[in-house]
Swiss-Prot record:
This is Phosphopantetheine adenylyltransferase. InterPro entries: Cyt_trans-like (IPR004821), PPAT (IPR001980), Rossmann-like_a/b/a_fold (IPR014729). It comes from Macrococcus caseolyticus (strain JCSC5402). GO terms for molecular function: ATP binding; pantetheine-phosphate adenylyltransferase activity. It comes from the Bacteria. Its main location: cytoplasm. It is found in: Cytoplasm. Substrate binds at S10, K42, L74, R88. Belongs to the bacterial CoaD family. Homohexamer. HAMAP family: PPAT_bact. Its cofactor is Mg(2+). Keywords: ATP-binding, Coenzyme A biosynthesis, Cytoplasm, Magnesium, Nucleotide-binding, Nucleotidyltransferase, Transferase. It catalyses: (R)-4'-phosphopantetheine + ATP + H(+) = 3'-dephospho-CoA + diphosphate.
């Protein structure tokens, strides 16, 4: 029986902090599903398809990582792919309260599902997708916080937005 984990997130866009958690999880599990969700409480900057493409490129050299889109309840998705673990990255203590609420609800819905928290390496602890977009929007250098393909995608997206009347 394979040891399967799910790393859910909006990944809008994926950062080196996300990639750190994905790589380390890939060393712990037989299969890691990076599951892209559409967060209704957030306005998406990149489309789901663009996010999946960027993540797939960033993880292409990690053979046991699969990238997929899902909608609906995370517990249902985990059951569909045979995962018994959810991996969540934590940047700081401030992330924990929200994550604990999610974990409690998932546990209420499926008592067999476990959530594992992984601290992001210190060099990535300040990075968020929102902050990354803000820096890129004003032409700041994001090369040290996102994979190269994401840096290019951000530049292209903002160039396109700035060309609009």
């Amino acid at each position: 029986m394979k040891n399967i984990a799910v790393i859910p997130g909006s990944f809008d866009p994926i950062t080196l902090g996300h990639l750190d958690i994905i790589k380390r999880s890939a060393g712990l599990f037989d299969v890691v599903h990076v599951s892209v969700l559409n967060n209704a409480s957030k306005q998406g900057f990149f489309t789901i398809e663009e996010r999946i493409e960027m993540i797939s490129e960033a993880v292409k050299d990690i053979p046991n990582v699969e990238v997929e889109y899902f909608q609906g309840l995370l517990v249902d998705y985990c059951n569909k792919v045979g995962a018994k673990q959810i991996v969540r990255g934590l940047r700081a203590v401030s992330d924990f309260e929200y994550e604990m609420q999610l974990t409690s609800m998932n546990k209420k819905l499926d008592d067999d599902l476990e959530t594992l928290y992984m601290m992001t390496n210190n060099q990535y602890s300040f990075i968020s997708s929102s902050m990354t977009k803000d820096v890129a929007k004003y032409g700041g250098d994001v090369s040290s916080i996102v994979p190269p393909n994401v840096e290019l995608a951000l530049k292209q997206k903002y160039a396109e937005i700035n060309r609009r009347p």
